[in-house]
């Protein structure tokens, strides 16, 4: 990846479809206190503060594609950029994040 290239992004609609119709992994990197309002059903919760210690829980670098979501997209875009530099070319972030998910009134579950 070019040092100045933007990390790969997917739309909120594509993320929802991935959770509902595929086995694509979606990683929610929000911190536990942010889960109080709910999480997308099927998302795997790995807080950003723990991600470095839990890399083994991610799909292997270059393997099946996976998505990273946070509250607005800022942290997830940053994390995907870092993951890409570590060889996780299969990672993309979700545009809009969980705040937009909630605005759409899409289903969420309590962790």
What are these regions (language model features)?
Residues 1-24, 32-65, 74-111:
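Rhodanese-like catalytic fold shared by cysteine-dependent sulfurtransferases
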């Amino acid at each position: 990846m070019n040092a100045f290239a933007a990390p790969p992004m997917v739309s909120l609609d594509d993320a929802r479809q991935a959770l509902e119709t595929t086995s694509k992994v979606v990683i929610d990197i929000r911190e536990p206190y942010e889960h109080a309002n709910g999480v997308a059903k099927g998302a795997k919760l790995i807080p950003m503060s723990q991600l470095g210690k839990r890399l083994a829980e991610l799909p292997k670098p270059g393997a099946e594609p996976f998505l990273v979501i946070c509250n607005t997209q800022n942290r997830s875009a940053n994390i995907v950029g870092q993951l890409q530099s570590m060889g996780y070319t299969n990672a993309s972030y979700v545009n809009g994040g969980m705040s937009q998910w909630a605005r759409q009134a899409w289903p969420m579950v309590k962790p």
